[in-house]
């Protein structure tokens, strides 16, 4: 689950980290009032969406009057912001963050992720702040500094000081960086985060360090342990198909291809997507119906897949283990009839009662293409999607 910038900064403040004074507002009038509360004569207004690249798309602006802040809120509230990290429809803007202006001398980067290879939280820092860190890691990986956190003892101040020296920080900045480093590490662990970024972490004109941005992603599997963070969820930022799928305990992720995929098991689903790609196709989604693939869930899965107008064919790949393939076949037939599927459907069944399942499909009288193997299924669905 992603958090908005203002929510991330709220958590930063709770851990004693330096952030700008700001208010998240949902009306133009409140934006003007926020300027009065903050004081001064310059403010930064930011559209709140779960995507980067807001500045380049006009979603971040420096304003010098309450009227300009109000006008910015009027411009964006209720609209959709399109950035390089969103699809063509963009993300809806329901909140504007109004905060004090910061005089920046230099921009740095500080972030943390769970590194699967070392099974540790790893912090990354760079002197190249304010830009896409993935690009820096690709073009100049030597500019990425790393510190691995030992789970038994946690983040240590000396690790923060080492990074600070490598970043070229001096004097009071070293202690400030170490405090931010340890605070972020505690925040990461306490709230089961999957990713945390401060981009940029800035050196102000007076030499102090300041967290100018906050990007936080929480491990969805740990949300049951984070009741407070559940209240931070903004459903307006969710893909409507993914949100609908979650109601039926279907794991769905929308992609940009034209071949719908329905599979039981996350690993098999990823393998199915890979083999579709291998044979020249483009998956329209990841969809794992899980072990209990009932007719109702298969029906909902079809509805979700077909709600994507780009889908030209559907591949159903089921491995029968606890669930029998003949039961799955009956569910597919019922779903195809109920939903009224008009595009080609390729089905590959393997495992428990696979032959009986194939027979049920063949006798259904429906235009369902039975595949003999996963390779055959991928080839068939790619041809079907191309109209061949």
Swiss-Prot record:
Which pathway or pathways does this protein act in? Carbohydrate metabolism; tricarboxylic acid cycle; succinate from succinyl-CoA (ligase route): step 1/1
Q: Which GO terms describe its cellular component?
A: cytosol; succinate-CoA ligase complex
Q: Does the keyword Transmembrane helix apply?
A: no
Q: Which Pfam families match?
A: ATP-grasp_2, Ligase_CoA
InterPro entries named among the record's database cross-references: ATP-grasp, ATP-grasp_succ-CoA_synth-type, ATP_grasp_subdomain_1, Succ-CoA_synthase_bsu_CS, SUCC_ACL_C, Succ_CoA_ligase-like_bsu, Succinyl-CoA_synth-like
Q: Does the keyword Nucleotide-binding apply?
A: yes
Question: Where do the ATP-grasp domain residues begin and end?
Answer: 9-244
Keyword field: ATP-binding, Ligase, Magnesium, Metal-binding, Nucleotide-binding, Tricarboxylic acid cycle
Q: EC annotation?
A: 6.2.1.5
Q: How does it assemble?
A: Heterotetramer of two alpha and two beta subunits.
Q: What does this protein do?
A: Succinyl-CoA synthetase functions in the citric acid cycle (TCA), coupling the hydrolysis of succinyl-CoA to the synthesis of either ATP or GTP and thus represents the only step of substrate-level phosphorylation in the TCA. The beta subunit provides nucleotide specificity of the enzyme and binds the substrate succinate, while the binding sites for coenzyme A and phosphate are found in the alpha subunit.
Question: What protein am I looking at?
Answer: Succinate--CoA ligase [ADP-forming] subunit beta
- Could you read off the lineage of the organism from its UniProt record? Bacteria, Pseudomonadati, Pseudomonadota, Gammaproteobacteria, Pseudomonadales
Q: Which gene encodes it?
A: sucC
């Amino acid at each position: 689950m992603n958090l908005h910038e203002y929510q991330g900064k709220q958590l930063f403040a709770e851990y004693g980290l330096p952030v700008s004074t700001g208010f998240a507002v949902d009306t133009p009038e409140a934006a003007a009032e926020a300027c009065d509360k903050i004081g001064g004569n310059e403010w930064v207004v930011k559209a709140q969406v779960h995507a980067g690249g807001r500045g380049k798309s006009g979603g971040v602006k420096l304003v010098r009057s309450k009227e300009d802040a109000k006008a910015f809120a009027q411009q964006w509230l209720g609209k959709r912001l399109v950035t390089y990290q969103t699809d063509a429809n963009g993300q809806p803007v329901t909140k504007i963050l109004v905060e004090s202006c910061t005089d920046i001398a230099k921009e740095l980067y500080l972030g943390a992720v769970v590194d699967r290879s070392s099974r540790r939280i790893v912090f990354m820092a760079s002197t190249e702040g304010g830009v896409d860190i993935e690009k820096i890691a690709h073009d100049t990986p030597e500019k990425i500094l790393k510190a691995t956190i030992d789970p038994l003892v946690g983040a240590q101040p000396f690790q923060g000081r080492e990074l600070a020296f490598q970043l070229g920080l001096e004097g009071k900045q070293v202690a400030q960086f170490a405090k931010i480093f340890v605070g972020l590490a505690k925040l990461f662990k306490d709230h089961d985060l999957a990713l945390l970024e401060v981009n940029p972490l800035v050196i102000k004109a007076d030499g102090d360090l300041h967290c100018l941005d906050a990007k936080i992603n929480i491990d969805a599997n740990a949300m049951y342990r984070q009741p407070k963070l559940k209240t931070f969820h903004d459903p307006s930022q969710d893909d409507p198909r993914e949100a609908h799928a979650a109601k039926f305990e279907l794991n769905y992720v929308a992609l940009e291809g034209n071949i719908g995929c329905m599979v039981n098991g996350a690993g098999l689903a990823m393998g199915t997507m890979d083999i579709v790609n291998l044979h020249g196709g483009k998956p329209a989604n990841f969809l794992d119906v899980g072990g209990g693939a009932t007719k109702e869930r298969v029906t909902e899965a079809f509805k979700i897949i077909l709600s994507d107008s780009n889908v030209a064919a559907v591949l159903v790949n089921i491995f029968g283990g606890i669930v029998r393939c003949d039961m799955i076949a009956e569910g597919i037939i019922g779903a195809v009839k109920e939903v009224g599927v008009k595009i080609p459907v390729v089905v590959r069944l393997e495992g428990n009662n696979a032959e009986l399942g194939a027979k049920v499909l063949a006798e259904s009288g429906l235009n369902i293409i039975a595949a003999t193997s996963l390779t055959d299924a991928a080839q068939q669905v790619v041809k079907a999607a191309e109209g061949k």
